[in-house]
A protein has these predicted regions:
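GNAT-family acyltransferases
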Residues: 1-73, 86, 90, 131-171
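Glycine-rich acyl-CoA binding loop
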Residues: 76
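Flexible ATP-lid and adjacent glycine-rich G1/G2 motifs of the Bergerat
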Residues: 83
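Conserved GNAT acetyl-CoA-binding A-motif
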Residues: 89-99
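Conserved beta-strand-loop-alpha-helix junction that forms the acyl-donor binding cleft
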Residues: 98-107
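Hydrophobic residues within well-ordered alpha-helices
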Residues: 110-111
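Conserved catalytic-core motifs of GNAT/GCN5-like acyltransferases
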Residues: 117-131
Length: 171
């Protein structure tokens, strides 16, 4: 890593990557968010909305990149909750999507844990790193949001966590 790279709590962002992110945010698709930890007092991750299609009411969450100190924390879950809440309640979308490489077991597990429903597999959907990539599709739709939101709110209550931020009840 050169001296011109930015390190965000373990996430390396080079000037080229920063230029790319800035250019993408000016178009609004994808639209990136920085994830800040109040507990750690630092930025720990990135996530974005992409494939934003207001004309048909669909939006995807992706480019999710967490530093090790954000992974598997209540803050990581809360960040995903806030983005989902904004997609449905703030922006008025009817469908919220999550897609990932079918080989990415952690991403698929995260999608299911966060309340997304598995929809299927697009075989050879793209070419990635000189190989065919099968893409797993997940979604939450507006009719499911009210119930899912209640689950998130119960999970995120401070009474659900001990002093070390370990949860008592799962999402």
């Amino acid at each position: 890593m050169g001296t011109d790279a930015y390190v965000l709590a373990g996430i390396v962002i080079t000037p080229v990557a920063l230029k790319y992110l800035r250019a993408k945010n000016f178009t609004g698709n994808p639209f990136f968010y920085a994830i800040y930890s109040k507990r750690l007092q630092t930025y720990c991750g990135l996530a974005s909305y992409l494939r934003i299609k207001p004309q048909i009411g669909t939006i995807e969450v992706g480019w999710i990149t967490y530093a090790p100190n954000l992974q598997r924390t209540v803050e990581a879950t809360e960040a995903m909750y806030l983005m989902m809440k904004n997609a449905f309640e703030g922006l008025g979308y009817r469908r919220y999507e999550w897609k990932c490489d079918n080989l990415n077991k952690r991403s698929k597990k995260s999608a299911l844990r966060l309340g997304f429903k598995y929809e299927g597999l697009f075989r050879q959907a793209t070419i990635y790193k000189k190989r065919n990539r099968d893409t797993a599709w997940f979604s939450v739709i507006d009719k499911e949001w009210k119930k899912l939101k209640k689950s998130y709110q119960r999970f995120l209550k401070s009474s659900n966590f001990d002093k070390n931020y370990e949860q008592f009840k799962k999402l």
